[in-house]
Amino acid sequence: MAKTLEGKVALVTGAAQGIGLAIVKRYVADGAAVILSDRNDAAGAGQAEALRKSGADVRFVHCDVAEPKQIEALMAASLKAFGRVDVLVNNAAIIDTAGFLDLDLETFDQVLAINLRSYFVLGQAVARQMVAQIKAGSAPGAIINMSSVNDHFALPDHVAYTVAKGGVRQLTRAMAVALAPQGIRVNAIGPGTIVTPLIANVVTDDAVRRRILSRTPLGRFGEADEVASIASFLAGRDSSYVTGETIYCDGGRIPLNYTVPVAG
């Protein structure tokens, strides 16, 4: 059976751990060559090296996506390594923990620079490259933006994060409509609470764990591999008529309008 991304090149940001790394590993299994990008050099280079030892074609490229010049360098390095980009996953993100009255402008700007502006800057750069590839005879590519259930919900203690994710949802729609004439598909994924290093401390606090699970109908946290499966679908041919959508991987949280009992 042919691998769904055989011969494709994928670029994934924020990919040294968690959901980003799970997507890299899934794309490798799907047959893609991958640019693994992160601002954490030790973790990113280490993960790329480990994957290469298993036979994968993975290159690490440092990038702090808050810096547009570093995004330019990331694109240049990706094209130097593989000559093309067929799939982009904008995944890099940070989270703030201040309430609305306490949030300072510097933090607000930093969160939006990474969680939203970089998705536009890199998304535009990759889309331009994809258009050039199409003109040269290649098939259209796919862009995937990592949103969150919090593009739907308001979190008073994560104001900048919530604002950024709401922006990602709308950016995804705007990009999808703008790029549809070229056949480039743009979609988003909206994870709920996924077991990653980012929330490791949260899920070990029993009170917090119970509160989260009380509003999660499936009664458990998600796994990074489950998000990666959606990223695989959106990158491949099986989603060829899907664009402008946000697919939520949240255990049923968004449609919930009640809390459920939690065992234990």
Report each predicted region and the residues it spans.
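Substrate-binding pocket helix/loop in short-chain dehydrogenase/reductase
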Residues: 99-100, 104-112, 212
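Active-site loop immediately N-terminal to the catalytic Tyr-X3-Lys motif
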Residues: 101, 153-159, 181-182, 219, ...
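Active-site helix of classical SDR
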Residues: 123, 164, 172
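Alpha-helical segment proximal to the catalytic Tyr-Lys
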Residues: 128, 177-181, 240
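Residue(s) in the substrate-gating loop at a strand-loop-helix junction
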Residues: 148
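C-terminal helical subdomain
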Residues: 170, 188, 207-238, 242, ...
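Short C-terminal tail/terminal secondary-structure segment
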Residues: 232, 243-264
